[in-house]
Amino acid sequence: MREGALALLRLAAVALAAPVVVAQAATAQQLLGGYAAQAAREMPAFTQFSAARGAEFYRAERPRADGVKAGCAGCHTADPRASGRTRANKDIAPLAPVANPQRFTDPAQVEKWFGRNCKDVLERDCTAQEKGDFIAYLLSVR
């Protein structure tokens, strides 16, 4: 009986921890694992992330409701190995981990910037698949 209760407690702990996989990640690959699990929940047909889709997402310019076209490369530059500039003229460190090894090492920062930038560019939250494709692309940049 006691073993059964312990097993249930362990199972409950795993179930409760599942949604916060992204919050506990320490590397880009761990972030991708968390986003993959989330993408599979959001979209049962999900199979894997695509660097090609991520590159397309990064380079795309999208018209916003105010008529202004916005895209990642608008501030981050066409080359994610290069430093970018915000609209307020502040420096942005390179997005590609090959040029900025600290990129994607702090899950809270990753989510903070996806939150801000997705809402600014897309006028909505990014999906887990979009986030994963985006990171897969940036990891592929050499």
Describe every region a protein language model picked out.
Residues 69-79, 134:
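The canonical Cys-X-X-Cys-His
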Residues 29-66:
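Electrostatic cytochrome c docking/interface patches
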Residues 84-91:
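Short cysteine/histidine-rich zinc-coordinating motifs and their immediately flanking basic loops
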Residues 10-20:
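Bacterial N-terminal signal peptides
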Residues 109-142:
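C-terminal capping alpha-helices of c-type cytochrome domains
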